[in-house]
């Protein structure tokens, strides 16, 4: 009997079962994160661990609709390289690696792919991977960041003003999922240089995009107030993220793939490749 209808983990299927999953047109989820410093109190796997945990819970709830790939655990991290343990991947390497994954699953016949990001600096890269996948295959590829789905709930319970890195948000999620790994006695509050239009970590909520070497402005590796993190908050925002992604999966699975129409009235040079 095939496990395709009940198994949500891509790498747990056999190749004959993969044929069944393709026939079901399961949506493929690719979690992405990073391996980088997260202060004195959190492990360096924060971004990939949190993102993968959210994606796996989505899979557990709707196993007949999705397959979750093993995550991409490394990302664009040179700005954190002054802190031991951080692994940096150059943007072109990351994009090409991710594109090889999405094109592989498209080649096998999966028509819908969702890249879920867990690391702010990867956002423009996964956007490009998704766009290139659509242009270079017959599948549709979407890109999102899981924490967009929890911010509404988090804003109701947050006690800190800055949400950025190793902060109240990430600390709360990690406390909920694996509290034994969090060293809360070492949690601190720390902030970057902030102006009206730009900050040292302008990846969100600023008019100007800018990210400085973190070794220039922090000795802790924290941006925000980690001391406000609690497992109770983490449970609330984890549920919000999972529920949001489940709703997104349902919408994307129903999204049509229409046939392209060529509007030219004169011959085109179809041999040109980009």
Which residues does each predicted region cover?
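Extended, histidine- and acidic-residue-enriched regions that form the cofactor-binding/catalytic faces
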Residues: 1-114, 120-274
